[in-house]
Amino acid sequence: MAQAAGVRRQLDSLTRNIFLRDVGRTVPEKSGAPLTGDSEVAPSVSLQIFLYFNAFYFPFWWVCYVIMLQLKYVLLPDYYKFILVVLLILMSVIEVIRLYLGYSGNLQEKVPELAGFCLLSILLQLPLLLFLLCDPGLEPLPLERAVHGILTAFLLIQIPISIFALRKATRHLAGRFHLLGDLDGRA
């Protein structure tokens, strides 16, 4: 019996080292106290800062995009007119959803929302912005290049930061799951 308890302690120590190496403790170690609903949430401050600035920059980008579209609308072929209007609507909807998912996923440490933010950023928003920046048929104006470039820079900075925040949140939740399983086994 004492040997089984020693093996259990060794396994417990090993799993704590593997799963909880860089995760803050959410319950007191070896206390046997019941786990309360309170948990430590550790959002990424750098991601939150860039989301904050992006939320304030997006209306400015939108107004500039609409003004530039109105200025060059008569010069564009019909298919580019259609593409640019659809892109404006699509990017506006995607950006609002993306910022909401980023805020809620980061602040509340919700992994699905943070993953959705990453996927929307990488798969939809970045290709659309690169199309607006790089297609010469759109006849981009200098102001357009500048505002699209700034939004692309925000996006290129947010993508790796959000991936690291997602990894951190996943590790944190895995550690909490491990602790819950460990506490249930002792009761």
Swiss-Prot record:
Pfam families: Transmemb_17 (PF09799). It is found in: Cell projection, Cilium membrane. Keywords: Cell membrane, Cell projection, Cilium, Cilium biogenesis/degradation, Membrane, Transmembrane, Transmembrane helix. InterPro entries: Uncharacterised_TM-17 (IPR019184). One of its GO terms (cellular component) is ciliary membrane. One of its GO terms (biological process) is smoothened signaling pathway. Transmembrane component of the tectonic-like complex, a complex localized at the transition zone of primary cilia and acting as a barrier that prevents diffusion of transmembrane proteins between the cilia and plasma membranes. Required for ciliogenesis and sonic hedgehog/SHH signaling. Part of the tectonic-like complex (also named B9 complex). Belongs to the TMEM17 family. This is Transmembrane protein 17A. It comes from Xenopus tropicalis (Western clawed frog).
